[in-house]
Amino acid sequence: LAMTRGADVALCLIESGCLSHRLSTPNKMMEAFAAGVPALCSPLSEARRYLGDQADRWVLDDPERDLVSALESITREDIEAFTTPTIPTWEEGAARLREAYERALTTRATHR
């Protein structure tokens, strides 16, 4: 994370040619957020979810078309205004996953 912390902006450009990629949560995006660095991201649903109100600034609709102009337009104020999204710990993520499995199993059991 030390090298990432030294960056003004990170890039998280994922080709979204298949559903698996479009629904992914890229490690590079999470590393940038953990370092407190904004990431210019491909139009991934998880990037939009984590960025919330900031998604319009940091998610590129068409990275191939928009990357250069997005990089050229970023100001120091944009970087300073960036609010790092809350990233769940492994334990929090595991607890939510376990709860989702339990709900699915309960639902399945009641529909038999």
What is each PLM-predicted segment?
Residues 62, 75-106:
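A charged, aromatic-enriched C-terminal amphipathic alpha-helix characteristic of glycosyltransferases
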Residues 8, 36:
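A short alpha->beta transition loop at the rim of the catalytic pocket in nucleotide-sugar-dependent
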Residues 107-112:
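Non-catalytic membrane-proximal stalk/linker segments that position and tether the catalytic domains
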Residues 48-52, 81:
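Short loop/helix-cap segments at secondary-structure boundaries that form the rim of catalytic
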Residues 2-6, 70-73, 96, 100:
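CheY-like receiver
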Residues 53-65, 72-76:
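Conserved acidic donor-binding segment of nucleotide-sugar-dependent glycosyltransferases
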Residues 33:
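Short alpha-helix at the nucleotide-sugar/activated-sugar donor binding site of glycosyltransferases
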